[in-house]
């Protein structure tokens, strides 16, 4: 098994993260394949050193909430493994999407205008769900100042018939001293209208419904809110989620139409874009193919928490 996985890794058909997941499921230690935790190979350790490094690993995880692990510690089989990208290497497209989602969540919470720049490192954990502790370098468009964000993003299993489910647990400026524990999303605190099975189409108007529930996004909205393009790229990724090369080959996306549906009946229709809970019906084109997507954004009202549930269908080739 190890030889087969090693061959798949070497030829690029298997990512480190996927291999981690397979090994965790088999109950093996990731070091059996010498998977890189840093750009340099980490030497083996004795049992006494393992015990000491396990304590150091726990200290680093506890103090940084999983964001700062130096790569020299002994990583448990199902622990948080660091990936260092350096100055010139880009992350996988999936990780970049998650980093941008964290910046978007922070901007909503703090009413800031941080711009995603790059990801110098991220840490990944399996196997119950894919959790990414992502360090993101950003630029504040208000004063052109640089900051470092820390985002905890989790891709979990489907709960409501969605193709892709992604949630944020932490979206913060990197603290100088250790902060609070991780606070998970409270599903029961989400508005009932946005819970349950994912819708496939725009809801029909009932007798008591108000047309103010719906807003068709205008071109100027897309220009002013780059996260609408992020949601559209997430929609494309949802369709190609098992083929990242296929996803990358279809970029960029061309937004055709977006309908926002929300229970918040703002008198100014454009304000629906700022609703904490909303459903986005997105039609877009990518690589001469038309797609339709339903993306549901919800929150439990706590800072740093967003849940995205996405279904996407390919309609036709143009």
Swiss-Prot record:
<dbReference type="InterPro" id="IPR006462">
    <property type="entry name" value="MS5"/>
</dbReference>
<protein>
    <recommendedName>
        <fullName>UPF0725 protein At3g44770</fullName>
    </recommendedName>
</protein>
<dbReference type="Pfam" id="PF04776">
    <property type="entry name" value="protein_MS5"/>
</dbReference>
<comment type="similarity">
    <text>Belongs to the UPF0725 (EMB2204) family.</text>
</comment>
